[in-house]
Design a protein with these regions (language model features):
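Conserved hydrophobic core element of enzyme catalytic domains
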Residues: 10-129
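Metal-dependent catalytic core segments for phosphate chemistry
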Residues: 1-6
Length: 129
């Protein structure tokens, strides 16, 4: 059930459209199978999903790793809450790693998509500046 749809959330460098979805757990599947069935999220892979993922693999120089993956928690009552790791940085060996992207579609304007990607990364870069 969609409890909230197309809510605009404003952040320091970007805006996001957010929807909240709740549902009943089907005991036919484990909680982990249920969660994994939604990844990678279509909002960051594209459609059709399998071909879009193949193109991403062909074109992107770096693997996504944490970026666009899932972060969340499980409760003892089989509830879970997750999000997609988009505004996330990784600090490893004293280096700060940031990945950002934009939703490329048929009528995308490359300059605008590039600017959007830079704006998304700026919030994290500012945090360590």
């Amino acid at each position: 059930k969609v409890t909230e749809k197309n809510i605009v959330e404003y952040y320091s460098h970007v805006m996001h459209i957010v929807s909240n979805v709740i549902g009943k757990f089907n005991n036919k599947f484990s909680i982990f199978e249920t969660l994994l069935s939604g990844f990678p999220a279509g909002t960051v892979s594209g459609a059709p999903k399998i071909r879009a993922m193949e193109i991403i693999d062909e074109l992107e120089k770096n693997k996504r790793k944490l970026y666009a993956g899932g972060i969340g928690y499980f409760t003892p009552n089989n509830e879970f809450d997750t999000c997609i790791a988009l505004r996330t940085a990784l600090i490893k060996n004293n280096k700060f790693y940031v990945q950002a992207g934009a939703g490329i579609v048929a009528d995308s304007e490359p300059d605008k998509e590039y600017a959007e990607t830079i704006n998304k990364a700026k919030a994290l870069m500012k945090a360590v500046d």
